Amino acid sequence: MAQAMINMMKQHPAHWAVLEGNLAQFMIHLDDADEVDPITGDTLLMAILCKDWEETRDKMVWVHMLIQKAKMMSQYINICKLNDSGRCPADALNALANEELARYIDVNILKEEFHELGLYIRGQQCSIEGLENEWVKVDRVPPITIKVPEQYKIETIITPRVPPMTIRVPAKYRMCPPLLIKVPIQYRLVRP
């Protein structure tokens, strides 16, 4: 399956950075590659983080992502938009405050030089004391960096210019460990 995905992606070199490696669930799904972002006009490519696409495709959270760089032992992924539909960009992390989505994802806020948001799939409890139910809203979405622990490293094939793509995070995702998301401090405030 992974090789088939890669072969498909190689047919669209300008539209793709493939995620492949130790995490079999980092697979790309191209069924809706013709969708267009109504704001930017970018074609939305959909990536799926799941072990079993058919089992989880009906419960997805959409995250527009741009791959910034990748290293063999440590992967960094830029999130450039976040929304719950794949078509209507929301106010950054605002989509995560939706009650239904909140059943699947918890976001922790650390008020430091950078906001570090713990992303947990399957509704796991927050691990940051006192911030279990705090949500973030920002006026616009800055690049957000996700660091995947090196023991979960993935090999990445990347083109020189990678457009925004959409990644679907399944609610029943079993294999992903908690990830840290860092938001630059200048984007922490909510517009009145």
Swiss-Prot record:
It comes from the Viruses. This is Uncharacterized protein ORF119.
